Amino acid sequence: MKIVKLITIFAMIATLMVTVTNGEAVFLTPDQIKAMIKRHG
């Protein structure tokens, strides 16, 4: 298992959690997820 894959899965789960919390649909492209990882990583 690659760390990048784990981070990507975690980012997707976190995005889903945020979507549920906000009560509105938030869709991120893989590029946006990568940008988020770069900012926070």
Curated annotation (Swiss-Prot):
This is U15-myrmicitoxin-Tb1b. Venom protein with unknown function. Does not induce paralysis when a high dose is administered by intrathoracic injection into the blowfly Lucilia caesar. It is found in: Secreted. It comes from the Eukaryota. Keywords: Amidation, Secreted, Signal. Expressed by the venom gland. The keyword Secreted applies. One of its GO terms (cellular component) is extracellular region. The keyword Nucleotidyltransferase does not apply. The modification Histidine amide is found at residue 40. Residues 1-25 form the signal peptide. The lineage of its organism: Eukaryota, Metazoa, Ecdysozoa, Arthropoda, Hexapoda.
